[in-house]
Amino acid sequence: MKRAFILVLDSFGIGATADAQAFGDVGSDTLGHIADQCAQGLADNAERKGALQLPNLSKLGLAMAHKESTGRFAPGLDERADIIGAYAHAAELSSGKDTPSGHWEIAGVPVLFEWGYFSDKQNSFPKELTDRILARAGLDGFLGNCHASGTQVLDDLGEEHMRTGKPIFYTSADSVFQIACHEETFGLDRLLELCQIAREELADYNIGRVIARPFVGPGKGQFARTGNRRDLSVEPPSATVLQKLVEEKQGRVVSIGKIADIYAYCGITDKVKATGIPDLFEATLEQIKQAGDNTIVFTNFVDFDSAYGHRRDVAGYAAALEYFDKRLPEVLELMQEDDILILTADHGCDPTWPGTDHTREHIPVLVYGKKVAPGSLGRRDTFADIGQTLASYFGTSPMDYGKNFL
């Protein structure tokens, strides 16, 4: 029975890539810099303290993959762990360092074109675009129109939004158009309808995602995003390994978290909603228990990126990694004879780095299975090696990019 479980620790980079200079990210290292801060006692909080402790990830080869990427061991990680998995560090072939590019490349389809971006920090959006969106939505104005941190923009504009009913439009260094609205005063359904309008009006702009950012709370300092985020992505430019599994093998692909949104539902047969790392982990365990032949269970743990990476919260990121590590044996215990587990990431988001954007880094590729030979798989030239390996494993037609590493 062929089953594969892909767990994406969103933004968990393990060292800058050779092309990081083009992105302003030379020296970035999400794992290494978190470990450095922990070792120096600078990442203590109510949940954790001291050196970074990731014994189970280290057994799967995380510390070794990081060393092969950066030339050094991350302090606190076990350099002498008994390695039980195959490990690698992978560079990105895609032109960007964004979520869709990383995920699509993982599934065998790198993004070789350039996304459209709203590069102006202020007055970011063309007036003709926002005029069309407002007219179709029956709105008389909007707030924002800038690059912004997703939590700071709520403090800056949330109360005015509640008072006026005007949605908050903002963007970032990624190819995104984000809309924040209060779930209670504006309405979640209304926000999602507005995002669909924006998605349609952005057809000629080559923007990767429209993101609905619902929030709640009575006022500044008390606003909080809810778990009802939606990502409206464009479709991948060609068939991913997910689509090939479904179409060629009548297989199942179970999306947990925002996976379905990222792939614009292409190649997704089942969607499980869960919010927060504990609930995402529980949902993953449940779906592994239920999974049959020719099934991929695919989970994105978005909080590493959204709650800790972008927020530059080193202690929070470290605590979340340690929580994930403690629960990892629960997945390993469910593995059957022919199963494959792949732990990876889609880009970096170094919480010690200037700004609030992603970082261009190698991703870890940690592979475990009872029939997988442990040891180094070296440097992979593209995330698409994961997709090609899955295509070979499930016996689908091969992908155009990537090399099988098993």
From Swiss-Prot:
The gene from which this protein is expressed is deoB
What protein family is recorded? Belongs to the phosphopentomutase family.
What is this protein identified as?
Phosphopentomutase
Give one GO biological process term: metabolic compound salvage
The record's annotation in InterPro entries points to:
Alkaline_phosphatase_core_sf, DeoB, Metalloenzyme, Phosphopentomutase_DeoB_cap_sf
Biological or metabolic pathway of the protein: Carbohydrate degradation; 2-deoxy-D-ribose 1-phosphate degradation; D-glyceraldehyde 3-phosphate and acetaldehyde from 2-deoxy-alpha-D-ribose 1-phosphate: step 1/2
Q: Which residues bind Mn(2+) 1?
A: D10, D346, H347
Q: What does this protein do?
A: Isomerase that catalyzes the conversion of deoxy-ribose 1-phosphate (dRib-1-P) and ribose 1-phosphate (Rib-1-P) to deoxy-ribose 5-phosphate (dRib-5-P) and ribose 5-phosphate (Rib-5-P), respectively.
Q: What is its EC number?
A: 5.4.2.7
One GO cellular component, as annotated:
cytosol
The GO terms this record gives for MF are:
magnesium ion binding; manganese ion binding; phosphopentomutase activity
* The reaction(s) this protein catalyses: 2-deoxy-alpha-D-ribose 1-phosphate = 2-deoxy-D-ribose 5-phosphate; alpha-D-ribose 1-phosphate = D-ribose 5-phosphate
Compartments annotated for it: namely:
Cytoplasm
Organism source for this protein?
Vibrio cholerae serotype O1 (strain ATCC 39315 / El Tor Inaba N16961)
The entry's free-text remark on the cofactor is: Binds 2 manganese ions.
Reading the lineage from the top rank, the first entry is: Bacteria
Q: Quote the record's binding site residues for Mn(2+) 2.
A: D305, H310, H358
From which lineage does this chain's organism come?
Answer: Bacteria, Pseudomonadati, Pseudomonadota, Gammaproteobacteria, Vibrionales
UniProtKB keywords: Cytoplasm, Isomerase, Manganese, Metal-binding
Q: So which cofactors does this thing need?
A: Mn(2+)
